[in-house]
């Protein structure tokens, strides 16, 4: 496990720091009441059983006083949006993981927008051990205060800054744990590129079972229905089981030829054993293919996570 961490593998829980609790925050809170956890087991063909804590969407909202006024404005607004307890949520998650699982995986939106303070928080908690997937907010400079390109050119403008805090290949990364290949891909705007597809196929050629780790879930009818109910129909009661027409990221996935073909291929790939994703801020799962279920985890800013055991 030490070697995995040194190589930048999945975050080894045994190497996580012992984090002091803040007695002023819920001083009588119990050890079992800190997190909202879902539990899943994946029969992936591991050479030895292991477990991980999967978290996503922490959404740090910090900015130093000397930073851009727009970032200071975002700090004020977005800290209220997320409740101001994101760092506590991550600290509790990592402390629980250190005692209960082997590894930690984060699937994006660890930060809410780009600021030096946010990137410093990433480094504070993970250093050079972080492994996972990026989210769309990792590339957001000023959120709605400027127009985001949502393409490779836009990401390239700040890729070096992002890379300084996220010590893994931002496009496609792979780490093998007990014979199971965890492959992360950048799909933060819904699409994947031909280069990413080829690199994924190279991972398949290794012949190992694969856990695909993404930020934006891949389109399935049930997950899209759940996302639509939570985000677009807030305040409305359920009236129809009809699957809503694709929009946003999902429209990209069903209309972009490369991405559409990649998803179709994945449904036939027998080495794919599961997909782990976030982005939606809700916990939901659905069978993706004959060999794989897609597990979406709720927002870590609300103390959500899921423990996944592998055999």
Where are these regions (language model features)?
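N-terminal active-site segment of His-dependent metallophosphoesterases
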Residues: 21-117
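His/acidic metal-ligating clusters that form di-metal
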Residues: 92-103, 181-183, 190-288
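Short active-site segment of divalent metal-dependent hydrolases/proteases
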Residues: 60, 111-112, 138, 218, ...
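Active-site glycine-centered loops adjacent to acidic/histidine catalytic or metal-binding residues
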Residues: 57, 108-109, 135-136, 215, ...
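Acidic/histidine-rich helix-loop elements
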Residues: 56-88, 140-165, 222, 247, ...
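Extended active-site neighborhood of metal-dependent phosphoesterases/phosphodiesterases
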Residues: 30, 34-44, 115-211, 235-238, ...
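N-terminal export signals
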Residues: 1-21
């Amino acid at each position: 496990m030490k070697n995995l961490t040194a190589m930048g593998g999945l975050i080894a829980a045994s190497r996580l720091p012992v984090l002091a609790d803040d007695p002023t925050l819920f001083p009588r809170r119990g050890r079992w009441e800190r997190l909202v956890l879902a539990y899943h087991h994946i029969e992936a063909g591991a050479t030895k059983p292991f477990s991980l804590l999967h978290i996503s969407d922490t959404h740090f909202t910090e900015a130093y006083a000397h930073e851009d006024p727009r970032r200071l404005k975002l700090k004020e607004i977005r800290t209220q949006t997320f409740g101001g307890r994101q760092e506590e949520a991550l600290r509790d998650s990592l402390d629980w993981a250190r005692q209960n699982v082997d590894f930690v995986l984060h699937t994006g939106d660890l930060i809410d927008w780009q600021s030096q303070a946010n990137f410093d928080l990433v480094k504070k908690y993970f250093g050079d051990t972080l492994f996972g997937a990026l989210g769309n907010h990792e590339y957001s400079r000023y959120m709605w205060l400027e127009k985001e390109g949502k393409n490779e050119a836009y990401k390239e403008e700040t890729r070096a800054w992002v890379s300084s805090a996220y010590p893994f290949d931002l496009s496609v990364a792979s780490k093998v744990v007990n014979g199971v290949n965890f492959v992360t891909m950048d799909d933060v705007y819904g699409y994947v590129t031909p280069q990413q597809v080829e690199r994924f196929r190279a991972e398949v050629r290794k012949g190992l079972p694969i856990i695909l780790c993404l930020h934006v879930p891949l389109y399935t009818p049930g997950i899209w229905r759940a996302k639509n109910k939570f985000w677009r129909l807030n305040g409305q009661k359920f009236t129809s089981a009809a699957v809503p027409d694709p929009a946003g990221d999902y429209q990209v996935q069903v209309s972009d030829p490369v991405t559409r073909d990649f998803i179709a291929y994945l449904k036939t790939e027998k080495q794919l054993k599961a997909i782990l994703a976030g982005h939606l801020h809700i916990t939901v799962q659905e069978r993706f293919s004959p060999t794989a279920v897609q597990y979406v985890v709720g927002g870590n800013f609300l103390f959500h996570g899921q423990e996944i055991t592998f055999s």
